[in-house]
Regions:
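Jelly-roll (double-stranded beta-helix
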Residues: 1-128
């Protein structure tokens, strides 16, 4: 899970807390864990990627200007959560307005380069 807008989100589990107070810092947890939420500073927006981990591997990465991310075979979403972003995917330029995304499916892997702005890349891969 990644906080994209706002600040001060804390997820409270029975025996620990999951600190999401700062935006764009990844936190992982078992989606089956019962949690409560604490909003310390008002409303927030988050990106959360959920999958059956017995069947799929998942990943959420943040890319800033200049970042090059290899996305292996699978399904990917390149999302611009805060402001517009420009990315290049295997040599093809794409402009994303704020809160818009590209869906990418690849059988052999692909390169995503962030030319401007900031993106989140969510990936889902079949387990071997």
């Amino acid at each position: 899970m990644r906080l994209t807008k706002g600040a001060g989100l804390v997820l409270l589990a029975r025996d620990h807390e999951i600190d999401l107070r700062l935006p764009m810092h990844p936190r992982r947890y078992d989606g089956g864990t019962p949690i409560r939420t604490l909003l310390e500073k008002g409303p927030v927006e988050v990106v959360n990627l959920i999958a059956d981990r017995a069947r799929f591997d998942i990943d959420l990465r943040v890319g800033k200007v200049g970042a090059e991310m290899f996305c292996k075979s699978g399904r990917h979403v390149v999302y611009a959560p805060v402001g517009a972003a420009q990315v290049e995917i295997d040599g093809h330029a794409h402009t994303l307005t704020e809160d818009h995304a590209l869906r990418v499916r690849t059988g052999s892997g692909t390169n995503v380069t962030v030319r401007d702005g900031q993106v989140i890349v969510g990936s889902i891969h079949d387990k071997p």
